[in-house]
């Protein structure tokens, strides 16, 4: 447990949830902890037993809170602050960007939302290396040479959404760019979906199955081609090798005809962004699109409603008993690895 510099009378808390992916957990943790520091509050993490990185990452359950107050706080129900989100019916997603209103909190709150903007770190990315300490043995075991590029392929449930899954051309163009720009010709695949990766990249070594190994490989790579998944952000940003990263332009709606960044929160200034045509853009070529997207939501989205009122449409999934779904999904993935996983 790290030393407590001061004891705050107010706290910000967040909770790890059932079904929440590791990337989303790390964003919720890091953003809430950073905001608590900014506001001079204590920090409290709830649901640590649901942390998907506990086998290889060390994090703090509370910061700047006395043990007595921590025990008391665990029994309290705090008021909730919901990060502002924008439902975009044309892109069919909930979009977010830096919610500056959270800085106006003057009392203890529980934060709920995605909180995936770098602006929540207030210009200090280096502190992430203190927030997340990776197990040295796991990192050493998964260290890779500097002349290998990691392809962080996301499959799984992404394959059910044609607007979300990245086309094979994205990966082919990114490999070509790595070769032409940096002379890289060796590639390694890190993925949550081994069968899908084997279908797409049969010629490459694949790291899959153990999330700690996947995280550590990304944390040691000098060159990375990222998917539009939140998982890769923290192993890349805490990587001591200052990696070169190519990521998909517009993020979760690659090549969308509206040319909106989906979401503006998921724009990271020091990454390279590749379009559907294979062209690479830096911050200068993308920041205008990001700012235009934010302005569009600010000017056009001014009606609030509860999440239950959003039109989610009908899904055949509701007709399948919950206990049977993972077994059916696994069975079908053997026959349709590029569609189901």
Language model: regions and residue ranges:
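A short beta-strand-loop structural module common to alpha/beta enzyme folds
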Residues: 41-51, 191
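Nucleotide-activated donor-dependent transferases that construct or modify glycoconjugates
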Residues: 2-19
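Donor-binding and catalytic core of enzymes assembling or modifying cell-surface/extracellular glycoconjugates
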Residues: 22, 168-172, 177-266
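A short, glycine/small-residue-rich beta-strand->loop->alpha-helix junction that serves as a flexible
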Residues: 17-27, 158-166
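Histidine-anchored nucleotide/phosphate-binding helix
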Residues: 26-37, 172, 176
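Catalytic binding pocket for nucleotide-activated donors in carbohydrate/polymer assembly enzymes
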Residues: 237-305
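Secretory-pathway luminal glycosyltransferase catalytic domains
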Residues: 10-12, 48-177, 181-182, 281-341
């Amino acid at each position: 447990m790290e030393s407590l510099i001061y004891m705050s009378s107010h706290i910000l808390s967040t909770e790890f949830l059932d079904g929440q992916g590791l990337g989303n957990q790390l964003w919720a943790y890091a953003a809430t902890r950073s905001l608590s520091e900014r506001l001079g509050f204590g920090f409290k993490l709830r649901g640590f037993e649901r942390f998907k990185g506990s086998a290889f990452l060390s994090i703090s359950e509370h910061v700047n809170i006395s043990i007595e107050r921590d025990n008391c706080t665990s029994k309290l129900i705090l008021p909730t602050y919901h990060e502002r989100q924008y439902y975009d019916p044309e892109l069919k997603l909930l979009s977010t960007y830096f919610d500056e209103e959270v800085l106006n909190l003057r009392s203890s709150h529980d934060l709920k939302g995605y909180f995936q903007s770098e602006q929540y770190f207030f210009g200090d990315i280096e502190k992430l290396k203190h927030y997340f300490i990776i197990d040295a043995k796991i990192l050493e075991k998964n260290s890779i040479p500097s002349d290998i590029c990691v392809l962080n392929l996301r499959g799984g449930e992404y394959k059910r959404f044609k607007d979300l899954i990245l086309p094979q051309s994205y990966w082919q163009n990114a490999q070509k760019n790595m070769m032409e720009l940096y002379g890289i010709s060796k590639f390694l695949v890190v993925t949550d979906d081994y069968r899908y990766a084997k279908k797409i990249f049969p010629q490459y070594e694949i790291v899959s199955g153990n999330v700690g190994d996947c995280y550590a490989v990304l944390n040691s790579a000098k060159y990375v081609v990222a998917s539009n998944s939140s998982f890769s952000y923290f192993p890349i940003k805490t990587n001591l090798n200052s990696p070169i990263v190519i990521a998909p332009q517009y993020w979760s709606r690659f090549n969308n005809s509206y040319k909106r960044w989906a979401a503006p929160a998921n724009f990271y200034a020091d990454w390279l962004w590749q379009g559907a045509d294979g062209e690479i853009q830096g911050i200068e070529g993308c920041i205008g699109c990001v700012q235009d997207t934010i302005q569009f939501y600010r000017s056009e989205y001014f009606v609030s409603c509860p999440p239950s009122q959003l039109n989610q449409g009908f899904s055949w999934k509701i007709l399948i008993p919950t206990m049977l779904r993972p077994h059916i999904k696994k069975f079908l993935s053997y026959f349709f690895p590029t569609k189901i996983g």
